[in-house]
Each structure stands twice: as structure tokens, then as C-alpha cells.
Amino acid sequence: MKRNWDLIRKILLKLEEKADSTSWLMSTDIQGYDFKTVAYHYKLLKNAGIIEALDISTMEEENFAALSLTWQGHEFLDKIRNDSVWNKVKSTVQSKSLDLSFDVIKQVATATISAMLP
């Protein structure tokens, strides 16, 4: 399964807006995606140190519940929160035929934000 960066951004935004730091964001709470895809992305984000998540897998299926953003998660979301910046990042990466990697997204987002400043 490939990483879906729009889903990753959606997860981070949803976790940030969650008022209660003790409640879980279940993989079924993200609309528009099947729970297995969301659970896989929770696992990726947890392994990357971007979110805190619990492994709630059963014998039948892998599943995760997201708890909160880490410091690194907040820092990354700060770079891609703005819709204009996010769309510019995606179009820049695509126009330059770059792979959408975590480091490339951070670099392009930083450059995009810098270009917006006076």
C-alpha cells in the first residue's frame, strides 16, 4: 500500500482539532477511507514519530487508534495546514517529477511559506 499524503494531512488535522487528549481517534473516524487504509497510515505515522497511537490489532486484523500529535507531528502540520500551501506543495512536487517523501514535502512547504513572506 502506498502512502496517501492527503489522508495523512487529514489525520493530522483531525488529531489537532480533537479537544480531549485522552480520547482515541479510531480508524473508522476518518471519513472517505476504509478503516484498513487509515489503520495502516496510523501505523506509518506512529513509526515515524509523528503521532502517538495504540496497536489495537486482533488475531483477525491489524488496527490502530490515534491518540495525539507528537512535537514533530505539530511541526510538520504547521507547514502543511494551510490549503494554499498544501496545494502549492503538491503541484510543485508533481511539476518537478519528485517523489512525495516526508523530507521533500517539508522542504517544499518551507520554501513555499518563505516565498509568501514579505
Give residue spans per PLM region:
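Non-catalytic, well-ordered alpha-helical scaffold segments
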Residues: W5-R9, A39, L67, W71
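Basic amphipathic alpha-helical segments that dock to polyanions
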Residues: A39-G49
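Beta-hairpin "wing" of winged helix-turn-helix
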Residues: A53-I56
